[in-house]
Amino acid sequence: MERLLMNVEEVVTREEFLRLKGGSAYLGFEPLWPIHIGWLIWAYKLAELKEAGFDVIVLVATWHAWINDKGSIEELRAHGERVRAVLDRIGKFKYVYGDDVAKDPKYWELVVKIAKETSLARVKRATPVMGRRAEEVELDFSKLMYPLMQVADIFYLGVDVAVGGMDQRRAHMLARDVAEKLGLKKPIALHTPIITSLSGTGRMEGTHREIDEVYAMYKMSKSKPQSAILITDSEEDVRKKIWAAYCPPRETKFNPVFEIAAYLLIPYHGPLEIKGRRYEEGNALERDYREGVVTPQELKEAVASALVGLLSKLKL
């Protein structure tokens, strides 16, 4: 169980997770196409859980994406099928579609029960799970239902572990709080790292935003193609984007090129070769990059080449 916590940003709680002897885990995603490489981090983590004996359920969140203005249900189901084809190259998971779940009255009963135990302020605070600021949700009341539905997903599926990026933290913490009030199983939250936008975060001084909201605001996004490496990008596109990416010397925090190396390539593609040095752990690369042993140019060259190799295995 300890090894399953490698390349994990946070687990709530570690003790609860280590007490598990198998069980079930879930992740929900809005079906968009093309996906970016940030999705691969949680996909590989799900595959590790599956290999360790967990029942892994992937919720293709069509209704959630529709609420979030990402397209019609029909379009979203079609996108979901394409995403599944990529995920099938990483692991074999059970899939559930949000619009199928929404046909069950018991699901909506859960949504209402969760709403009864949650303040409006708490719901608004949980909206960064949508990739939106809390102030944006007042444009459309349905968006306030999104966090409630995400919590209902966890209880409806009856899973032990809720998996997601750090941007999903508030919804998962809401689920843990509400579980106690409703007498339901409290889910363990397992949060994987987020890859920052290739353009960086800009000046964040004085924003006073919580870390999960920062992740939601500055992560890679398919809607901003130059901020992300897309699964459909050509080798030329990948190399151009990496060479143009924000990658300050001696700085690893919110450095997207370092994050790609440490969170995706080294754990799931293999050791990274940089100028005769072989990095088998992200910590070793972090140390050398911070000390200037590895330069931004050297890091970009190695990351671009390794990333092209990884994506070649996943393209449809």
UniProtKB/Swiss-Prot annotation:
Q: Which GO terms describe its cellular component?
A: cytoplasm
Which residues of this UniProt protein bind L-tyrosine? Y26, Y146, Q150, D153, Q168
Q: Which Gene3D superfamilies does its entry note?
A: HUPs, Tyrosyl-Transfer RNA Synthetase
InterPro entries membership: aa-tRNA-synth_Ic (IPR002305), Rossmann-like_a/b/a_fold (IPR014729), Tyr-tRNA-ligase (IPR002307), Tyr-tRNA-ligase_4 (IPR023678), Tyr-tRNA-ligase_arc/euk-type (IPR023617), Tyr-tRNA_synthase (IPR050489)
Might you give the EC number(s) for this enzyme? 6.1.1.1
* Compartmental location: Cytoplasm
Where does this chain carry the motif 'KMSKS' region? 219-223
* Residue positions binding ATP: K222
> Which terms does the UniProt entry file under GO BP?
tyrosyl-tRNA aminoacylation
Q: Which reaction does it catalyse?
A: tRNA(Tyr) + L-tyrosine + ATP = L-tyrosyl-tRNA(Tyr) + AMP + diphosphate + H(+)
One annotated GO molecular function is:
ATP binding
Pfam families named among the record's database cross-references: tRNA-synt_1b (PF00579)
Sorted keywords for this record are: Aminoacyl-tRNA synthetase, ATP-binding, Cytoplasm, Ligase, Nucleotide-binding, Protein biosynthesis
Enzyme class per UniProt? ligase
How does this protein assemble? Homodimer.
Q: Which family does it belong to?
A: Belongs to the class-I aminoacyl-tRNA synthetase family. TyrS type 4 subfamily.
What does the record give as the function of this protein? Catalyzes the attachment of tyrosine to tRNA(Tyr) in a two-step reaction: tyrosine is first activated by ATP to form Tyr-AMP and then transferred to the acceptor end of tRNA(Tyr).
HAMAP family tied to this protein: Tyr_tRNA_synth_type4
Q: What is this protein called?
A: Tyrosine--tRNA ligase 2
